[in-house]
Amino acid sequence: MAQKLKLEMVTPAAQVLSEEVDEIAAPGSLGQFGVLPGHTPLLTTLQVGEFSYRKGSDVYYLAVNWGYVEVAEDRVLVLVETAETQDHIDLARAKAALGRAEARLRELTPADKEYHNMQAALQRAMVRIQVAGRGGRG
């Protein structure tokens, strides 16, 4: 059994990560889950949320937006729509997006076509703010 996981994260635009890590924690569609070396093979979906990985005593965080995770042979492949590291999140922009989504949701009802899109925008903004607020490595 390997002592590390090979973590690869890819978006449609680019490869975001290719790292040897000790563990990961991901926002699964059915709840948060973790993966350590030797984990049982797994294929699952991700929801919008905070993704983290640990290298030694350092923990790194990313905001991810919907995707898939495959765990096999001490390798974790993450395919997501978007992924932003702490350093690449513009906190002011994320807060502005949160404000816009909150304001728009106050004007809508669940019957409106735009309602669910605004809920998703609100969730993405909240996760981006949470990840940006981590203030560096955990």
UniProtKB/Swiss-Prot annotation:
The organism sits in which domain of life?
Bacteria
Q: How does it sit in the membrane?
A: Peripheral membrane protein
InterPro entries listed in its UniProt record: ATP_synth_F1_dsu/esu, ATP_synth_F1_dsu/esu_N, ATP_synth_F1_esu_C, ATPsynth_dsu/esu_N
Q: Which CDD domains match?
A: F1-ATPase_delta
Recorded GO terms, molecular function? ATP binding; proton-transporting ATP synthase activity, rotational mechanism
- Keywords assigned by UniProt? ATP synthesis, Cell inner membrane, Cell membrane, CF(1), Hydrogen ion transport, Ion transport, Membrane, Transport
Instruction: Spell out the subcellular localization from the entry.
Output: Cell inner membrane
One cellular component term from this protein's GO annotations in UniProt: plasma membrane
* Quaternary structure, from the entry: F-type ATPases have 2 components, CF(1) - the catalytic core - and CF(0) - the membrane proton channel. CF(1) has five subunits: alpha(3), beta(3), gamma(1), delta(1), epsilon(1). CF(0) has three main subunits: a, b and c.
Q: Which family does it belong to?
A: Belongs to the ATPase epsilon chain family.
User: What is its biological role?
Assistant: Produces ATP from ADP in the presence of a proton gradient across the membrane.
The identity of this protein, by name, is ATP synthase epsilon chain 2
Native source organism of the sequence = Syntrophotalea carbinolica (strain DSM 2380 / NBRC 103641 / GraBd1)
